[in-house]
């Protein structure tokens, strides 16, 4: 085993338990008080050093407890490591680095046979090949995560660009469609009818973000007409902005807004007593339908469709046995046919005498 920064068996700096951080803000404190420690890949390791294990021969229980968090490759006790009286120190190597991380986080400062465990990483027990393997795995993980992030960002920009292109292509014919009637506006998912054209005044007036109005060259025209033209231009510009915003919202959220039908609106604002009466009426209708269906099935009605195969007659090759079997069949038919059937009015009375219990509203 290779050591990097200290003699094996001696207490190293990263093996010492740090004090609890007292300067942490209240909103950052967890359930248990902890110290502030940042672990990089060179400080993490498959090897975990467990200190504070009571010297009662509980190595089997300790290994079983740590095996809950991952596969353990090897474990052994460190007799030469300095420890407190009546305690032992164990070294456990996990097969995966993530298992070692979880085991350290879960088992650190946990009670075990009356003692408090202290779990820390022990990268000094790694060989050169194990360290290289750990660094290669970390590099592969970083490359994979950055690649996924770049792919996600590229896809996000591409989707935004495609949405802009689709939006511009759909809004390119928007002014022409606004000249049509409300039937044309229903294709654009507009909530109102815009039968009037966007600019129903002089073609010299342009209603856009860079608003410009050319005064007519005729000096005899008064200022009132010019003010009316400006007012119309402002009105059309605001109307066009409202239509563009409505179209953008409808394209951004397709299918999310659904108009309520008149029946749904009426059901929503129906009083509670009326709703209960309506439910009671529906239950009674269901009971009547079930009774009618039972009566129809019980009546001898000719059914159109493929007939089921009849019961095959068993031939016992003995006349006496065949006679006995036929007598038994006839007797069974008489017994079945002699069962009285309740009339239909009694069936309805039974259903009415036992009404369905309504569910109480809490």
From Swiss-Prot:
Residue spans crossing the bilayer: none
Keywords: mRNA processing, mRNA splicing, RNA-binding, Spliceosome
GO biological process terms, semicolon-separated: mRNA processing; RNA splicing
Source superkingdom: Eukaryota
Chain positions covered by the region annotation Disordered: 334-362
Oligomeric form and interacting partners: Component of the minor spliceosome. Within this complex, interacts with ARMC7 and PRPF8/PRP8.
The protein's role, per its UniProt record: As a component of the minor spliceosome, involved in the splicing of U12-type introns in pre-mRNAs.
Record's protein name: RNA-binding protein 48
The species this protein was found in: Bos taurus (Bovine)
């Amino acid at each position: 085993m290779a050591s990097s920064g200290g003699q094996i068996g001696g207490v190293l700096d990263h093996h010492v338990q740090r004090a609890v951080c007292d300067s942490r803000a209240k909103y950052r404190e967890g359930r248990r008080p902890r110290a502030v420690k940042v672990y990089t890949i060179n400080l993490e390791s498959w090897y975990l050093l467990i200190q504070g294990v009571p010297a009662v021969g509980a190595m089997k229980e300790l290994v079983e407890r740590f095996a809950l968090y991952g596969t353990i490759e090897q474990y052994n006790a460190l007799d030469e490591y300095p420890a407190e009286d009546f305690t032992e120190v164990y070294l456990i190597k996990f097969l995966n680095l993530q298992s070692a991380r979880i085991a350290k986080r879960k088992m650190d400062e946990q009670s075990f046979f009356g003692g408090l465990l202290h779990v820390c990483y022990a990268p000094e027990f790694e060989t050169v090949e194990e360290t290289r393997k750990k660094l290669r795995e970390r590099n592969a993980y970083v490359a994979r995560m950055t690649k996924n992030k770049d792919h996600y960002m590229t896809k996000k920009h591409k989707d935004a660009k495609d949405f802009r292109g689709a939006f511009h292509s759909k809004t390119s014919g928007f002014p022409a469609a606004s000249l049509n009637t409300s039937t044309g506006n229903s294709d654009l998912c507009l909530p109102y009818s815009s039968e009037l054209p966007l600019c129903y005044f002089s073609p010299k007036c342009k209603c856009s973000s860079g608003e410009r109005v050319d005064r007519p060259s005729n000096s005899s025209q008064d200022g009132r007409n010019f003010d009316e033209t400006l007012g119309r231009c402002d009105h059309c510009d605001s109307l066009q902005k409202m239509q563009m915003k409505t179209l953008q919202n409808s394209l951004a959220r397709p299918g999310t807004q659904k108009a309520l039908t008149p029946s749904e609106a009426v059901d929503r604002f129906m009083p509670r007593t009326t709703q209960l009466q309506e439910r009671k009426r529906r239950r009674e209708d269901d009971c009547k339908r079930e009774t009618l269906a039972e009566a129809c099935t019980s009546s001898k009605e000719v059914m159109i469709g493929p007939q089921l195969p009849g019961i095959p007659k068993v031939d016992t090759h003995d006349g006496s046995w065949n006679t006995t079997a036929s007598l038994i069949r006839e007797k069974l038919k008489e017994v079945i046919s002699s069962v009285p059937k309740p009339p239909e009015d009694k069936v309805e009375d039974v259903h009415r005498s036992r009404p369905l219990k309504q569910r109480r509203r809490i």
